[in-house]
């Protein structure tokens, strides 16, 4: 028989930098999970990733206080900031432009994010990426 799921926990953890300090420690500790077990497993799975890349993770918590976790791709804003070579988006996205991304960069980001997006075609994924870019104050060129 399958284990009984008691809850889910969503966190965004830097790759290779999971440690028991806040926010990870308290979030897992409140639910009675082994914090160090998660940290070691997460850091082992994110060794290939670039250091400090934010990795969204969904932790499934079971009744016997065991857990499994699924890692997602980094947030779209992370990829867009890398592509535009900026530190942060525009403070006033409708008026001020923070930078530019090309259609080729948008396609590349859409291909990376495809498995986490709720769409079927690369074109619809590109539209989602373009929308995120505009909301950050980035201009989509080409």
UniProtKB/Swiss-Prot annotation:
GO cellular component, one term: cytosolic large ribosomal subunit
Post-translational modification: One or more lysine residues are methylated.
One GO-annotated biological process of the protein: translation
UniProt KW keywords: Methylation, Ribonucleoprotein, Ribosomal protein, RNA-binding, rRNA-binding
InterPro entries recorded: Ribosomal_uL11 (IPR000911), Ribosomal_uL11_bac-typ (IPR006519), Ribosomal_uL11_C (IPR020783), Ribosomal_uL11_C_sf (IPR036769), Ribosomal_uL11_CS (IPR020785), Ribosomal_uL11_N (IPR020784), Ribosomal_uL11_N_sf (IPR036796)
GO MF annotation: an example: large ribosomal subunit rRNA binding
Pfam families: Ribosomal_L11, Ribosomal_L11_N
Family listed: Belongs to the universal ribosomal protein uL11 family.
Biological function: Forms part of the ribosomal stalk which helps the ribosome interact with GTP-bound translation factors.
Quaternary structure, from the entry: Part of the ribosomal stalk of the 50S ribosomal subunit. Interacts with L10 and the large rRNA to form the base of the stalk. L10 forms an elongated spine to which L12 dimers bind in a sequential fashion forming a multimeric L10(L12)X complex.
Protein name: Large ribosomal subunit protein uL11
Organism placement in taxonomy: Bacteria, Pseudomonadati, Pseudomonadota, Alphaproteobacteria, Hyphomicrobiales
Gene that specifies this protein: rplK
